[in-house]
């Protein structure tokens, strides 16, 4: 116990109170504040308990009716909470609307205040659509997306309004979208498509509580007829945005093309589809007068106001920015992979498009609360009619059995729908709306919440992408690799590797096979994500243990590299150790001199003199120059590896030593009579040779040498794309590819690099493509087909001496496609130059035609 004295113990000391520290009195929370602390969380979670929903509506509405209008604190807290739910958790809008209408029927002042507040919010966001000073936060979905969500909420409140009040807003928005669309009759206008699609998607919500209003139905039919007649949906096919090369596993569907048919189908047959989608809460709805109107007409921005904003390229919010390029539906869970039924509500239905829209809004607007997003997306079904989805966690085997017994039984899985939509955000081209880490960790959270239900869903997605690796976009392979590796590292590196054994056995001898390289990169990435080598090793069957070698170049090449530095001296293989300085190993002739150099690198900045280093190098030359084949090259390698070794504890240490010693290195290197390009190539070769077993660190250390002014990005690219025989690590090694993207991205914000690295990388890749085509020995007018092989085929059926060359060709072509798309703004400026020279640059016709098309498309992405 705490051995505290009782009050009586102080009775003898009458003055003890004078010395007791004076504590401030505990502040009493005002009743209205306490009420808000209890009530607002209940509003935010409304509808999450189906059983308590009716009671929640009753109790919350009574509290609001009684309290609204008395205290500004309560009024403001209520309105801001309602707004937060409406724009951050759109699946709950109908519940909030029901609550609002029940309140309105008994306290019209409160009801009117709520609709006025949301109308003002709508007007506020309309003004923000053309505000050049608009600042977007990470969870900002955009002004137009906010307009969509607020209009949807007001639409659910249709029983409160005169019919024309809402119809006029719809009409104005459609008129604006049509005017914007007509600004450029030959090309898509992103903002026009966003307004058109968003507004159409809201129309069925007018009938949520108002399904028997014939006047409303007539007005909506007239509105849809007007839109269909006056809005031209433009055909867009941007190959750069295709997720697959060649034949995709599913039809590419553009959201703007399906929204009107989806809405029309939802409204026919006496709203049959809506009756199956929306829950029937009319028994909870209290009578509404239906005569409400807004105080003012909504003022939309004019076409002139919006002319500089129609491309949606000003970073006005994550969802609004998605419309910058055509928006396609993304699929993972196809019917033929699960049986003769679908587990995801088709995008060709109103429900499918709406669910897709809601999940995206949830994921984007609640980005600041990832744990909440993980919970919400899997419980989306609570806010729609029961029976649309199967029971959570039901396996595909159970579904197949149920479906065979009863073809009318539900087969849609909320888990599949949520995961597929989030994967669509991860695999979105040309860029993603949030950092990848957010999406990856969100999926980890979802799986951790219910691993038995979600793990099989992930497994089916892993298998889907793996089965299409031959045609999956080059950049998307890297995203798939990242996602897969992060999921595995969070779940004990558990995977059914035996499923891939046949592919490894049959294609392991090929350098460019996509599936073998994926497995290799995956295992090596797993090793980088853990310090426990055996944890990964123990998870692998024997066939895959050969991929545990993380070396950038093979061991024999590494030995030859060091041997090339000497004449009359043989390098002992045991002396070449992983991530260690070879030159200080016991038995290496200049070991003691090298230790002097290492002592020099560790000296404090104010106690180092470069003349001391020069003296040590002079000593080295005098004593060992006779066994060194090229002393200039040797000095560069030795000094670079000595500095690299000194900073090998961490990247921060590497940066420190490189920055501390950069001037000394520059002084020494300046006296070496080699051209700059040769010196730089020797530097990066020395770095990657030291870090051969950990090339990711090697490339990051090379970046540090670049920032120190000892290296350029161009030399890094030259090294990465150097070929040994037909083998080019820069095309298949994930860390090298990441280094290419990283250095190109860095140049966008750097002005210190001379020359155009974007042009250099493009031309280097085209050169690799041309040499590969020459080796394939195809005619100029002959197409090259993606190899159609798999691990189930007999080995005799797939013998093809040019199989690896074909994979190499499609790898390098995919790389070209990725850089043109990823850096479209930079390549747009080079487009005319490329096109003018492309006939000579790329002789092969179909390759030239494909790349020419991509170059032209950079203007559209």
UniProtKB/Swiss-Prot annotation:
UniProt protein name: Nuclear cap-binding protein complex subunit 1
Motif Nuclear localization signal per record, residues: 22-30
Species, as recorded: Saccharomyces cerevisiae (strain ATCC 204508 / S288c) (Baker's yeast)
Pfam families: MIF4G (PF02854), MIF4G_like (PF09088), MIF4G_like_2 (PF09090)
Keyword Cytoplasm: yes
Record flagged with keyword Membrane: no
GO cellular component terms, A-Z: commitment complex; nuclear cap binding complex; nucleus; perinuclear region of cytoplasm
Domain of life, per lineage: Eukaryota
GO BP annotations listed: 7-methylguanosine mRNA capping; mRNA 3'-end processing; mRNA export from nucleus; mRNA splicing, via spliceosome; mRNA transcription by RNA polymerase II; nuclear-transcribed mRNA catabolic process; nuclear-transcribed mRNA catabolic process, nonsense-mediated decay; primary miRNA processing
Domain named MIF4G: residues: 36-264
Subunit structure: Component of the nuclear cap-binding complex (CBC), a heterodimer composed of STO1/CBC1 and CBC2 that interacts with capped RNAs. The complex interacts strongly with the importin subunit alpha SRP1. The SRP1-CBC trimer also binds to capped RNAs, but formation of the importin alpha/beta heterodimer upon binding of KAP95 to SRP1 in the cytoplasm causes dissociation of CBC from the RNA. The CBC complex is part of the commitment complex 1 (CC1), binding to the cap of pre-mRNA and interacting with U1 snRNP subunits MUD2 and SNU56.
């Amino acid at each position: 116990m705490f051995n505290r004295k009782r009050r009586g113990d102080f009775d003898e000391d009458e003055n003890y109170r004078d010395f007791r520290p004076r504590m401030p009195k505990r502040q009493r929370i005002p009743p209205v504040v306490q009420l808000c602390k209890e009530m607002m969380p209940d509003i935010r979670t409304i509808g999450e308990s189906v059983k308590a929903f009716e009671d929640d509506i009753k109790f919350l509405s009574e509290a609001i009716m009684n309290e609204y209008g008395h205290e500004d604190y309560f009024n403001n807290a209520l309105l801001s909470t309602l707004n937060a739910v409406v724009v951050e958790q759109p699946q709950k809008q109908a519940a909030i609307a029901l609550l609002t209408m029940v309140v309105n029927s008994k306290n019209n002042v409160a009801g009117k205040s709520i609709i006025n507040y949301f109308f003002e919010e709508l007007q506020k966001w309309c003004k923000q659509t053309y505000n050049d000073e608009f600042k977007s936060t990470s969870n900002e979905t955009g002004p137009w997306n906010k307009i969509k969500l607020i209009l949807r909420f007001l639409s659910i409140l249709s029983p409160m309004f005169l019919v024309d009040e809402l119809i006029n807003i719809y009409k104005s928005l459609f008129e604006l979208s049509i005017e914007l669309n007509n600004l450029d009759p030959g090309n898509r206008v992103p903002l026009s498509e966003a307004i058109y699609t968003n507004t159409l998607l809201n129309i069925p919500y007018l009938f949520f509580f108002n399904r028997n209003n014939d006047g409303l139905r007539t007005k909506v039919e007239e509105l849809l007829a007007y839109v269909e007649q006056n809005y031209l949906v433009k055909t867009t096919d941007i190959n750069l945005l295709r997720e697959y090369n060649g034949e995709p596993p599913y039809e590419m569907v553009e959201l703007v093309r399906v929204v009107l048919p989806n809405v029309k189908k939802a409204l026919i047959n006496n709203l049959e589809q809506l009756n199956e989608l929306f829950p029937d809460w009319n028994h909870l709805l209290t009578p509404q007068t239906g005569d409400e109107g807004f105080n003012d007409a909504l003022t939309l921005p004019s076409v002139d106001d919006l002319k500089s904003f129609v491309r949606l390229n000003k970073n006005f919010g994550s969802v609004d920015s998605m419309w910058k390029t055509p928006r396609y539906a993304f699929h993972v869970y196809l019917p033929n992979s699960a049986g003769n039924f679908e587990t995801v509500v088709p995008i060709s239905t109103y429900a499918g498009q709406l669910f897709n829209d809601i999940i995206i809004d949830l994921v984007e607007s609640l980005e600041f609360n990832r744990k909440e997003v993980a919970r919400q997306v899997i419980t989306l079904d609570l806010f729609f009619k029961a029976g649309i989805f199967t029971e959570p966690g039901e396996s595909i085997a159970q579904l197949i059995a149920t479906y065979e017994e009863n073809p009318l039984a539900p087969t849609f899985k909320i888990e599949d729908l949520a995961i597929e939509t989030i994967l669509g955000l991860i695999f979105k081209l040309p860029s993603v709306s949030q950092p990848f880490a957010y999406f990856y960790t969100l999926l980890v959270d979802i799986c951790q919440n219910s691993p038995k239900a979600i793990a099989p869903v992930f497994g089916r997605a892993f298998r889907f992408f793996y089965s299409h690796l031959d045609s999956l976009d080059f950049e998307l392979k890297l995203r798939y690799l990242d996602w897969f590796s992060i999921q595995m590292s969070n779940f004990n590196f558990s995977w059914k590797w035996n499923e891939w054994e046949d592919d490894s056995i049959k294609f392991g001898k090929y350098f460019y096979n996509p599936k073998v390289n994926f497995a290799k990169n995956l295992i090596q990435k797993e090793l980088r994500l853990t310090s426990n080598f055996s944890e990964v090793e123990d998870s692998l069957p024997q066939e895959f243990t050969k991929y545990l070698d993380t070396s950038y170049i093979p061991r024999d090449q590494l030995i030859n590299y060091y041997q090339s530095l000497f004449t009359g001296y043989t390098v002992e293989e045991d002396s070449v150790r992983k991530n260690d300085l070879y030159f200080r190993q016991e038995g290496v002739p200049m070991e003691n001199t090298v230790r002097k150099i290492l002592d020099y690198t560790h000296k404090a900045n104010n106690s180092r003199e470069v003349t001391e280093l020069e003296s040590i190098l002079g000593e080295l030359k005098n004593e060992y120059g006779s066994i060194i084949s090229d002393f200039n090259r040797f000095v560069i390698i030795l000094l670079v590896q000595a500095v690299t070794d000194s900073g090998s504890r961490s990247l921060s240490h590497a940066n420190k030593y490189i920055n501390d010693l950069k001037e000394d290195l520059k002084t020494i290197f300046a006296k070496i009579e080699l051209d700059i390009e040769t010196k730089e190539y020797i530097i990066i070769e020395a770095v990657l040779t030291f870090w051969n077993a950990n090339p990711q660190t090697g490339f990051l250390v090379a970046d540090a040498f670049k920032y120190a002014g000892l290296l350029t990005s161009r030399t890094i690219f030259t090294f990465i794309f150097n070929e040994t025989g037909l083998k080019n690590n820069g095309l298949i090694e994930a860390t090298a590819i990441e280094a290419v993207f990283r250095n190109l991205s860095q140049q966008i914000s750097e002005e210190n690099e001379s020359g155009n690295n974007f042009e250099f990388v493009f031309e280097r890749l085209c050169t690799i493509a041309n040499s590969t085509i020459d080796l394939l020995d195809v005619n100029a007018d002959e197409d090259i087909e993606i190899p159609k092989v798999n691990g189930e085929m007999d080995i005799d059926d797939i013998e093809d001496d040019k199989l690896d060359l074909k994979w190499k060709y499609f790898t390098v072509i995919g790389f070209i496609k990725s850089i043109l798309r990823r850096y479209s703004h930079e390549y747009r400026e080079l487009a005319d130059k490329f096109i003018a020279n492309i006939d000579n640059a790329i002789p092969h016709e179909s390759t030239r035609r494909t790349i020419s098309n991509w170059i032209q498309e950079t203007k559209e992405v």
